[in-house]
Amino acid sequence: MVSGRGLVVTAKMLNAKKKELQDLLDVRIPENSREIGRALELGDLRENAEYKAAREEQTRLNNMVTRLQEEIERAQVFDPTTVVAGRVSFGTVISLKNHTSGEDETYTILGPWESAPERGIISYMSPLGSNLLNRKTGEQLAFTVGEHEKVYEILSISAAEI
């Protein structure tokens, strides 16, 4: 599913991240440069809180650009037609029996960019997601997160609508 240091993503999320990068480069960094210029006009840089804040923001924005560029470079767009029925992978919906809590749970396995645990979307890189990968319906798995042991049984696997 993931080759080398690749990052599996949906086409929609890759486009969103490219737009976010463009916004940083075309809007936010130029705005920050203007803020630095205005702060410089205030004089003494040793006691210039506006200048210091603008420079800190510049560092933060540049770090965001670097991180996004690296992640976009690593991104591999997921092809939904590659989902294998009956095997957990990126792009599947998994119904589980949580034997630790006794509850039934349902998750969609996507990437870290799409992850929204509060909506039942988990990353294939998360502790649960990575332990589920390549497993089949009916399999049980047990793993530890921190000091808590988790025990699950896979009830069903289906293709997610992406």
From Swiss-Prot:
The keyword Transcription regulation applies. It comes from the Bacteria. InterPro entries: GreA/GreB_C_sf (IPR036953), TF_GreA/GreB_CS (IPR018151), Tscrpt_elong_fac_GreA (IPR006359), Tscrpt_elong_fac_GreA/B (IPR028624), Tscrpt_elong_fac_GreA/B_C (IPR001437), Tscrpt_elong_fac_GreA/B_fam (IPR023459), Tscrpt_elong_fac_GreA/B_N (IPR022691), Tscrpt_elong_fac_GreA/B_N_sf (IPR036805). Signal peptide: none annotated. Residues 46-77 form a coiled coil. One of its GO terms (biological process) is DNA-templated transcription elongation. GO terms for molecular function: DNA binding; RNA polymerase binding. Keywords: Coiled coil, DNA-binding, Transcription, Transcription regulation. The keyword Coiled coil applies. Necessary for efficient RNA polymerase transcription elongation past template-encoded arresting sites. The arresting sites in DNA have the property of trapping a certain fraction of elongating RNA polymerases that pass through, resulting in locked ternary complexes. Cleavage of the nascent transcript by cleavage factors such as GreA or GreB allows the resumption of elongation from the new 3'terminus. GreA releases sequences of 2 to 3 nucleotides. Belongs to the GreA/GreB family. This is Transcription elongation factor GreA. It comes from Treponema pallidum (strain Nichols).
